[in-house]
């Protein structure tokens, strides 16, 4: 995504009130219950539902939009579908998603940016799933970009769509996370599922089109859920 300019940046997020933390735990429990219910009802007959993981960071636990986006995307990757298969299957895909989300911070970037990964790269080997992937030191969600807003400010024009998805929707949030996930994992051929797009608009569009092609049906279903 054009959203991945390689620059160094950091953000500190603090949570100062016990009441806020208590509310966050209730939020997480509520969303996990909703996701487990949807997974149970998604098939026919009796379905064994694996427990959803705890939020991978305090930020994901406390931020309602980010929390919901994480569990929406986790739910997509937990299913047996074209999207999860593209990422090597559910066990691998969900492990890397949770690791990615554990690194996320919120920053105020230029309005068209959705998510940005930058800095030192670490290679990770997850033994239980035999998954090898990479992580960037800095992973930023733009607090005034399409993940959270339709406009970056009251005086600016509407933030443009990414692919087929309107800004500040459940669909675009999952789309952004899945796009970034594609830059962290390799396919069976040894190449990154999505090559680094950096500042290349053409490559960014190609990468976005690939995610929409393989995950579009699952992303579309998010708009039908409450």
PLM features per residue range, with description:
Residues 1-10:
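Bacterial N-terminal signal peptides that target proteins for export
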Residues 23-174, 184-226:
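Predominantly extracellular/secreted Zn2+-dependent metalloproteases
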């Amino acid at each position: 995504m054009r959203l991945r300019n390689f620059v160094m940046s950091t953000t500190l997020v603090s949570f100062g009130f016990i009441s806020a933390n208590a509310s966050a735990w209730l939020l997480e429990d509520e969303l996990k219950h909703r996701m487990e219910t949807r997974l149970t009802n998604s098939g026919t007959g009796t379905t064994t539902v694996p427990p959803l993981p705890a939020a991978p960071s305090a930020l994901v636990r406390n931020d309602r939009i980010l929390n919901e986006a994480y569990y929406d995307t986790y739910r997509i990757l937990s299913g047996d579908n074209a999207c999860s298969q593209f990422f090597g299957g559910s066990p691998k895909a969900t492990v890397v998603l949770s690791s990615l989300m554990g690194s996320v911070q919120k920053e105020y970037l230029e309005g068209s940016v959705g998510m940005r990964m930058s800095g030192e790269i670490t290679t990770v080997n997850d033994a239980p799933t035999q998954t090898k992937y990479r992580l960037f030191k800095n992973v930023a969600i733009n607090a005034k970009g399409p993940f959270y807003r339709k406009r970056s400010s009251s005086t600016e024009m509407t933030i443009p769509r990414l692919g087929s998805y309107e800004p500040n929707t459940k669909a675009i949030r999952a789309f952004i996370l899945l796009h970034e996930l594609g830059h962290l994992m390799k396919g069976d051929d040894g190449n990154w599922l999505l090559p680094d797009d950096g500042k290349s608009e053409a490559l960014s569009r190609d990468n976005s089109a690939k995610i929409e092609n393989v995950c579009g049906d699952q992303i579309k279903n998010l708009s039908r859920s409450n």
